[in-house]
């Protein structure tokens, strides 16, 4: 969980980019992943 916490802190810098990527991934996978 420590690694995830550190990763989240890093992703927070690219929150907007992550949201776009996650939205694209969700659409690509057909919303299979949350």
Swiss-Prot record:
Q: Which GO terms describe its molecular function?
A: toxin activity
Tissues/organs with expression = Expressed by the venom gland.
**UniProt entry tagged with the keyword tRNA processing:** no
Alphabetical GO CC annotations of the entry are: extracellular region
Keywords associated with the record: Neurotoxin, Secreted, Toxin
Location of this chain's protein in the cell: Secreted
Hey, which family's this protein in?
Belongs to the scolopendra toxin 3 family.
Name by which UniProt lists this protein:
Scolopendra 5848.48 Da toxin
What are the leading ranks of the lineage? Eukaryota, Metazoa, Ecdysozoa, Arthropoda, Myriapoda
């Amino acid at each position: 969980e420590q690694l995830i916490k550190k990763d989240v802190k890093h992703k927070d810098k690219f929150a907007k980019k992550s949201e776009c990527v996650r939205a694209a991934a969700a659409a690509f996978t057909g919303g299979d992943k949350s």
